Every structure is written in structure tokens, then in C-alpha cells.
Amino acid sequence: MAAAVLANKVAKLESPKVFVDSAGTSNWHVGQGPNPPSKRTWEKAGYSFDHIASQFNYSRLVAADLVLVMDKDNHMEVSRYVTSEEEERKIYYLREFDTSGPDSLEVPDPYSLPDSAFESVLEMVEKATDGLIEQLLI
């Protein structure tokens, strides 16, 4: 969901040019399309995004300028690939960019929960991606 929201928002920017990629930290859903409730939620909010699940790896860390994680488990898994301070400095919790001062830096995983949980996550993601874009434009 975060990739869908961010990709749609940065597509409207003339500069800087931003490439949005998404990968899971496990191989559970590799090759599959988006989770139906997640896709339904972002489409209802006006976002479009095509996605096939893939797994994060060291090459992606090296290629990225910024790696956004959703929770502590994601952070731990992504950090396993870090071989330098430069690579470590690329990793941020998405909600670090939420200027409303969230109670937690973690975005909960709504998988297997009702649509209302996906809508709550969408709201968190929208706030955080707005803050991220503000930072990109500085």
C-alpha cells in the first residue's frame, strides 16, 4: 500500500525524479499480486498501482537512495544486509516522516484484518508520504 501511495504522489513531481520500488522481507508472497483488501483500499482512495511481490535483497539496498520500512521486524531484516554506515543511513521507518508526531514509528500490518484496518493504515501512509515528499522538496 505504501508503494502505491508514494508512487502516485511522486509521479506528480517534476523534480526530483523518484523511482518507487517495493519488496517484502520474506518470500511468502513472491510472484503474487497485491493483497485484495489492500488494493481495494488504495483504489477506493484514487490510487492506481501494478505490483507483483518480490523479496528484498542486498542489490536493492545498494541501488536505493532510501529504504523505507514499516516496522521493527522489517528494520531488523533489512539491516541484516547492511555492510557499511552509508548503507545503514539509507534505512528509515516510513512514519519518521509523519509530521503529526505519531505515537509509534511502526505501521501495523493489516493482513487478515477487516477493511477498516486497511483504511487506518492508508491514513498513516498518506501522512508519512506527505512528510517524506516535503523533505524531498527541501
Region annotations inferred by a language model:
Residues 1-138:
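Short polar/charged helix/loop
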